């Protein structure tokens, strides 16, 4: 059975971020994606200028009520949330999660708590970080912070892999069953590798791949793709190890393709066959 994922995050008309980055790769792995956009911008904000609007929070709820009205909400296997335009949008998303789980008790909530970036600092509207700490985290089944976001969620510094595992376990005590630390950055074993951790109450998997050097301008949307692909693989029944290995390789293929084409925006269409069947392989290690 093909899995259906309600993906609630940002949308850009030009380029790739949020749903505009993750939607196609998720579909390429064989999932039905229902994109619901928290913002519609001309382009992502790292360009320094953009046009567009943040969707009214009630818009999100209205759209989902429309899906419920045609009796399709029970076919939703998971809700994925990413970039929020406001804390109030977050409250509406949690209402949507409750509504989906009422229609399908097996449905999962994957929260990508987009708040900041090791190089960019905090990048969200006031109140969003507090929303994730107080409400998003306890409501989630799976949560996928980067290092900055992990520190915000656990409310203390994380300096190495061991501390990252302990911090992830602190989050698990508050709600989620799975924590993906999607960029260990300075807390990783090696400064010249891209490292991730996948943590549950009784398992820890670590993986690393080469960093792809884009100089001063790192492509946007890598985390969005990572979260979306991990959710698809887990819904399709992959083990933690299998999911982590496939996602790491698929994202690496996108990065290598983007670099080879000398582009700044993620080249998800050009890399599509290697998203489905990566040519590289990176082995996850159980810690």
Swiss-Prot record:
Q: Which InterPro entries match?
A: PM/HMP-P_kinase-1, PyrdxlKinase, Pyridoxal_kinase_PdxY, Ribokinase-like
GO MF annotation terms: ATP binding; magnesium ion binding; pyridoxal kinase activity
Keyword Glycoprotein attributed: no
**Keywords on this record?**
ATP-binding, Kinase, Magnesium, Nucleotide-binding, Transferase
According to its UniProt record, the EC number is: 2.7.1.35
Q: Where does substrate bind?
A: 10, 45-46, 224
Q: What family does the database annotate?
A: Belongs to the pyridoxine kinase family. PdxY subfamily.
Binding-site list for ATP: 112, 144, 149, 182, 209-212
Q: List cellular component terms (GO).
A: cytosol
User: What is this protein's name?
Assistant: Pyridoxal kinase PdxY
* Reaction(s) this enzyme catalyzes, per UniProt: pyridoxal + ATP = pyridoxal 5'-phosphate + ADP + H(+)
Query: What GO biological process, any one, is recorded here?
Result: pyridoxal 5'-phosphate salvage
Q: Give the matching Pfam families.
A: Phos_pyr_kin
Cofactor(s), names only, from the UniProt record: Mg(2+)
User: Where would one find coiled-coil regions in this protein?
Assistant: none
Cell membrane as a keyword of this entry, yes or no, is no
Enzyme class, UniProt record, top EC level: transferase
Q: Which NCBIfam families match?
A: PRK05756.1, pyridox_kin
Originating gene: pdxY
Subunit text: Homodimer.
The record describes the protein's role as:
Pyridoxal kinase involved in the salvage pathway of pyridoxal 5'-phosphate (PLP). Catalyzes the phosphorylation of pyridoxal to PLP.
Source organism (scientific name): Shigella flexneri
Please give the pathway this protein is involved in: Cofactor metabolism; pyridoxal 5'-phosphate salvage; pyridoxal 5'-phosphate from pyridoxal: step 1/1
